[in-house]
């Protein structure tokens, strides 16, 4: 079974093994995660080649040892927040590989999670799947994704989603400042400085701290709402840039997942059958 997380800039995909009854093996999460930038000129060719190459060992193994087929080996579960045109290109590649595409959609309740949104369609499927992944870890979780946007969601130990926040990523904040105020567009800076002595560092450090401040404020509100501190679960491409600082400032358990959406997608696939 293939799992595909199609985001605003990249496709992340992985395979998960199953048993002949069609469910993922106990405790099995995504396998090796492969990331492809979908604005790359070779994206379509690379994806098709990857899918074709992966299919050959499975066919050879079944022919060699007579092992029973995995009933879900030809399934491809797709979670997409990308533009429609990009999604259609991915679906075309999956279809060419003989895979059955199944789409993940936000549900009001799924796998022990009850979302706060009255209209499930309003909650991005990536955030929804992140909640499913967090639920599997147990306890209260503040789920933060540092991707094209910064999203924060609070999930309590009973599986209730308390809602969330959406903010601007540091890279987009820097870009917006440079476009609105050309004098601030002086190139890349060092986000690690405490107080900058030049414009590039000042912009880089401030935009980094804006995203950090969003999470710190959300943490305070989460503690007040729950009456206890939650664990913090980070995902997204920039998660590692914030993990150490958050662990130090919050004195809390901070975990980083490089496959947060894919892990939630695997749990969604099992729940939906």
Annotate each language-model stretch with its function.
Residues 1-5, 77, 141-145, 233:
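Short glycine-aspartate micro-motif
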Residues 1-71, 160-186, 190-193:
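Short glycine-rich, Thr/Ser-proximal phosphate-binding strand/loop in the N-terminal lobe
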Residues 34, 191-231, 253-254:
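Adenine-nucleotide phosphate-binding core of ATP-dependent small-molecule kinases
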Residues 41-44, 108-112, 260-264:
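A short acidic, often aromatic-flanked loop/helix-cap motif at beta-alpha or helix-coil junctions
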Residues 57-122, 158-162, 169, 200-201, ...:
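Short beta-strand-loop/turn "lid" adjacent to the catalytic site in phosphate-handling enzymes
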Residues 100-103, 108, 112-180, 209-218:
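Phosphate-binding/catalytic loop of phosphoryl-transfer enzymes
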Residues 120-130, 185-195, 273:
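A polyampholytic, Gly/Pro-enriched intrinsically disordered region
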Residues 254-273:
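Glycine-rich phosphate-binding/hydrolytic loop that grips phosphoryl groups
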